């Protein structure tokens, strides 16, 4: 039992370390330290889809402030790039750990505990566009494939990912599968191509509903791109044979500029956020134009090691029935 546990931990570490090294080299970012707490009221917390309640923390020696465990570091990263004067094409990555206790489903792929490679880069001049988004997606996908090949060589786990990732807009997807739910559309298209980047998540589609929810103040999901499509963000999805479904590895995008921020908070009714320090800084031109995202660490390990449950590669909390159903939950 001990030997099996140690081997399991060695596999997890190998995937994480290998991916980290490739990501830093290929994406050209530096690894930095990030926070676990965010001060309430500065606007730095990631509100995700807008419905999740963060974990509140009171610090004894700072009685006049309340803090929250971060959901992600989407806004902190952009603030940090500005604070330390990162130049165009430069960026950072954080080994981010977070808690999302309002996760509405604790299942094979969702956990209260979130670990990500949280990265952000300053966009080169003239490249705040769909082409640069796709170029960055292809770089990250290359890192995923290189890591998969390293796992194959070390553990004899057959590589399954296609050489290229396929791009498709959410508007195209709803037109192609009008009678399916968003999740069913993801399953259908990802099963065909093996690896897909789904572009434009957050805005209302022709069927009157968004593909999925996104906060209005980090990704740009409203800017028109091509053929009347909208959105400069998206998800990297791969086909997971163990689960028989599409499997999200990363959510990422070009971040809002001043106009996209104002447009999106008006659409979602979140204009009050513009009073926060972070949002004021953006509107006053103090932040660089950036692209960024989060790549799920446990999800990546789960996929590349062909595990059935995310609890096999991370230590979290689970209902007893989950522990009873899977032998290798950590």
Curated annotation (Swiss-Prot):
GO terms for biological process: L-asparagine biosynthetic process. This is Aspartate--ammonia ligase. It is found in: Cytoplasm. PROSITE patterns: AA_TRNA_LIGASE_II. Keywords: Amino-acid biosynthesis, Asparagine biosynthesis, ATP-binding, Cytoplasm, Ligase, Nucleotide-binding. Its main location: cytoplasm. Belongs to the class-II aminoacyl-tRNA synthetase family. AsnA subfamily. Disulfide bonds: none annotated. Its EC number is 6.3.1.1. It comes from Streptococcus pyogenes serotype M2 (strain MGAS10270). Pathway: Amino-acid biosynthesis; L-asparagine biosynthesis; L-asparagine from L-aspartate (ammonia route): step 1/1. It catalyses: L-aspartate + NH4(+) + ATP = L-asparagine + AMP + diphosphate + H(+). The keyword Amino-acid biosynthesis applies. One of its GO terms (molecular function) is ATP binding. The keyword Amino-acid biosynthesis applies. One of its GO terms (cellular component) is cytosol.
